[in-house]
């Protein structure tokens, strides 16, 4: 696939699976725009915007932000993009979001190219998330409010309950590719490249 062609990659996996790290690298190396609804929302919270004030209690509680807010953010981000070359990290999380995204991508003539699902055992995920918070604190950086064990466990449960149907949705469409998310970042990245050609 040449750089001038549409390419839409959707990263799936539980919180702490490494989606953000891998999406950043893939975006850089394949000239794709990374769209992370989590990053966009945290930026709004940090800036104290009206949207940030609305979603802060939701994020702090480890809950998922309502679809209407996320879909509006994505529509705005994709507006005018030509060609559409993007990686989604943290969106969609529900079948309703996936259907809305599919409709938007159809309007743009840019169907989903690949959906890698990063798979990591729950206890490894919790350890990664808590360690991410510890490392940020050691560096004197702000610690994400969701980088605690309690919130991380709640997020894992919410993920399982609300995201499994999405995994089934993409599997039924032949887009889903299972990727072992355990190993060094390079090992995981090389596995991702095998499914995102």
From Swiss-Prot:
Pathway named in the protein's UniProt entry: Purine metabolism; AMP biosynthesis via salvage pathway; AMP from ADP: step 1/1
PROSITE patterns hit by this protein: ADENYLATE_KINASE
Matching CDD domains: ADK
Stretches the record annotates as LID: 131-147
Catalytic activity: AMP + ATP = 2 ADP
GO MF term set: adenylate kinase activity; ATP binding
Stored InterPro entries: Adenylat/UMP-CMP_kin, Adenylat_kinase_CS, P-loop_NTPase
GO biological process: AMP salvage
One cellular-component annotation, GO: cytoplasm
Known function: Catalyzes the reversible transfer of the terminal phosphate group between ATP and AMP. Plays an important role in cellular energy homeostasis and in adenine nucleotide metabolism.
Domain notes: Consists of three domains, a large central CORE domain and two small peripheral domains, NMPbind and LID, which undergo movements during catalysis. The LID domain closes over the site of phosphoryl transfer upon ATP binding. Assembling and dissambling the active center during each catalytic cycle provides an effective means to prevent ATP hydrolysis.
Subunit field text: Monomer.
NCBIfam families: PRK00279.1-3, PRK14527.1, PRK14531.1, PRK14532.1
Name listed for the protein in its UniProt record: Adenylate kinase
Top-level taxonomy: Bacteria, Thermotogati, Deinococcota, Deinococci, Deinococcales
Name of the gene: adk
């Amino acid at each position: 696939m040449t750089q001038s062609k549409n390419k839409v990659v959707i990263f799936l996996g539980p919180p702490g699976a490494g989606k953000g790290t891998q999406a950043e690298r893939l975006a850089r190396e394949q000239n794709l725009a990374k769209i992370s609804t989590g990053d966009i929302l945290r930026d709004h919270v940090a800036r104290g915007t009206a949207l940030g004030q609305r979603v802060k209690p939701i994020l702090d509680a480890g809950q998922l932000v309502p679809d209407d807010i996320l879909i509006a953010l994505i529509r705005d981000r994709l507006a005018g993009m030509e060609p559409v070359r993007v990686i989604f990290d943290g969106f969609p999380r529900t079948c309703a979001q996936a259907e809305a995204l599919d409709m938007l991508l159809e309007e743009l003539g840019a169907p989903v190219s690949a959906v890698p699902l990063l798979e990591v055992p729950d206890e490894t995920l919790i350890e990664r998330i808590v360690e991410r918070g510890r490392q940020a604190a050691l560096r004197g950086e702000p610690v994400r409010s969701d980088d605690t064990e309690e919130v991380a466990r709640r997020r894992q449960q919410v993920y399982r309950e609300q995201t499994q149907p999405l995994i089934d949705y993409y599997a039924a469409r032949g887009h889903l590719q299972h990727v072992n998310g355990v190993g060094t970042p390079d090992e995981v990245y090389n596995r991702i490249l095998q499914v995102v050609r």
